[in-house]
Amino acid sequence: MNDISTIFKEKKLKLTPQRIAVYKYLKSTHEHPSAETIYKAIQSDYPTMSLATVYKALKTLAEVHLIQELNVGEGNFRYDANSSSHPHIQCLSCGKVDDIMGITFDNLNKDVSSHTDYDVISNKLYFYGICKDCKDKA
């Protein structure tokens, strides 16, 4: 939890129990939960916390780069505590989102820069397919 304390102190932001709870939950899972899923998971420990508070905490955590906000389409967002640059794959059947680790963007960033008049600052790469569980059910 040192990283969140340090970052919030540097940014002069208030570190609330709600923000800590949301961050801890995200750090404890390899899933990419929605705000609603996070809310339901921590509601028993924080019964007075609203869904709006969870959304605000997620927005702040994303703004300080402690988490990633993943736009999985149609206004549907998921959240990832692994803030390093990495691609994701989403199941088109069940909506599950997984990390794809071990792929670097170095060459892709250079190629994009050399083919455009842009300096690449960041990127997000998504793949779509059918997960093993859904294939096994078919």
From Swiss-Prot:
Zn(2+) binds at C91, C94, C131, C134. Residues 1-73 are annotated as: DNA-binding. One of its GO terms (molecular function) is zinc ion binding. The keyword Zinc applies. The keyword Transcription applies. Disruption phenotype: Cells lacking this gene exhibit almost complete aerotolerance and increased H(2)O(2) resistance. Deletion of perR does not affect the intracellular level of iron but increases two-fold that of zinc. CDD domains: Fur_like. InterPro entries: FUR, Fur_C, WH-like_DNA-bd_sf, WH_DNA-bd_sf. Keywords: Detoxification, DNA-binding, Metal-binding, Repressor, Transcription, Transcription regulation, Zinc. One of its GO terms (biological process) is regulation of secondary metabolite biosynthetic process. Belongs to the Fur family. Represses the expression of most of the genes involved in oxidative stress response, such as rbr3A-rbr3B, dfx, rd, nror, fprA1 and fprA2, coding for reverse rubrerythrins, desulfoferrodoxin, rubredoxin, NADH-rubredoxin oxidoreductase (NROR), and oxygen-reducing flavoproteins, respectively. Thus, by controlling primarily oxygen and reactive oxygen species (ROS) scavenging, PerR plays an important role in the oxidative stress defense system in C.acetobutylicum, an obligate anaerobic bacterium. Probably acts as a peroxide sensor. This is Transcriptional regulator PerR. The lineage of its organism: Bacteria, Bacillati, Bacillota, Clostridia, Eubacteriales.
